[in-house]
């Protein structure tokens, strides 16, 4: 059996990835596929933390554009990530993977509050930990949550699993047929060229803490395991 390249990872799942082709809500087939892929790497003794977005249910930015108070709209988005996290927890536990959800906003009836040392202990016991409710603060994306939690738990890498693209391109491949995929990038490249990998706050946090990022498609089964084993998939972003 191949040895994993990374021992502790943060898997970043967009909310849209959980919606699948239906584009909204939670697609049971997709969430089951993601859970099975997480199980594959957990069985390699990789410590797995997950950050899930909420865009399949609600986006704070859209609410703000509709005239809502931005902070209130963002809090709604955080609650959407909790719904996704509980669905993923259920799917993982149905296939025998012990999972804990930790939320940045306290809701003890459904999940643990986020406590860094407790999260690390869960990981050391080979439990999957899902970080929900973003950072607990409005104006911060779940990409920034992934970068922040990766720094806090000293993860080796962030695995950014996308549903509509298999890496980072110099243009939108769904619009421009000449778009070229990057094999490797630096965070400075991402920031300078405005590439839509993650927002600038998240990119800067990863750069400052020297956390590598792999962007790949989650829709192809086995890709999460391939990324953990260090196979050449997607786009790798690192350093300055």
Swiss-Prot record:
Positions bound to ATP: 12-15, 55, 59, 163, 169, 172
One Pfam family cited in the UniProt record for this chain: AA_kinase
EC number: 2.7.4.22
Source superkingdom: Bacteria
Keywords: Allosteric enzyme, ATP-binding, Cytoplasm, Kinase, Nucleotide-binding, Pyrimidine biosynthesis, Transferase
Annotated InterPro entries: AceGlu_kinase-like_sf, Asp/Glu/Uridylate_kinase, Uridylate_kinase, Uridylate_kinase_bac
Pathway: Pyrimidine metabolism; CTP biosynthesis via de novo pathway; UDP from UMP (UMPK route): step 1/1
Catalytic activity, reaction form: UMP + ATP = UDP + ADP
Record: residues binding UMP: 54, 74, 135-142
Listed Gene3D superfamilies: Acetylglutamate kinase-like (3.40.1160.10)
PANTHER family: URIDYLATE KINASE, URIDYLATE KINASE PUMPKIN, CHLOROPLASTIC
This protein's name: Uridylate kinase
Species per Swiss-Prot/TrEMBL record: Bacillus anthracis
């Amino acid at each position: 059996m191949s040895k994993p390249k990374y021992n502790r990872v943060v898997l970043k799942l967009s909310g849209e990835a959980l919606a699948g082709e239906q584009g909204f809500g939670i697609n049971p087939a997709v969430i089951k596929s993601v859970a099975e892929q997480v199980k594959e790497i957990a069985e390699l003794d990789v410590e797995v933390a997950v950050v899930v977005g909420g865009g399949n249910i609600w986006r704070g930015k859209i609410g703000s554009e509709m005239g809502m108070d931005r902070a209130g709209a963002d809090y709604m988005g955080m609650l959407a990530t909790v719904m996704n996290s509980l669905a993923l927890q259920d799917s993982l536990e149905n296939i025998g993977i012990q999972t804990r959800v930790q939320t940045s906003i306290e809701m003890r009836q459904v999940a643990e509050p986020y406590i860094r040392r407790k999260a690390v202990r869960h990981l050391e016991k080979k439990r999957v930990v899902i970080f929900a409710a973003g950072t607990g603060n409005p104006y911060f994306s779940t990409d920034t949550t992934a970068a922040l939690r990766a720094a806090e738990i000293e993860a080796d890498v962030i695995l950014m699993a996308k549903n509509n693209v298999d890496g980072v391109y110099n243009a939108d491949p769904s619009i421009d047929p000449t778009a070229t995929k990057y094999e490797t990038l630096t965070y400075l490249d991402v920031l300078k060229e405005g590439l839509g990998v993650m927002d600038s706050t998240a990119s800067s946090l990863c750069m400052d803490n020297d956390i590598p990022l792999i962007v790949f498609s989650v829709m192809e089964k086995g890709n999460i395991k391939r990324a953990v084993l260090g196979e050449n998939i997607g786009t790798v972003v690192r350093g300055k």
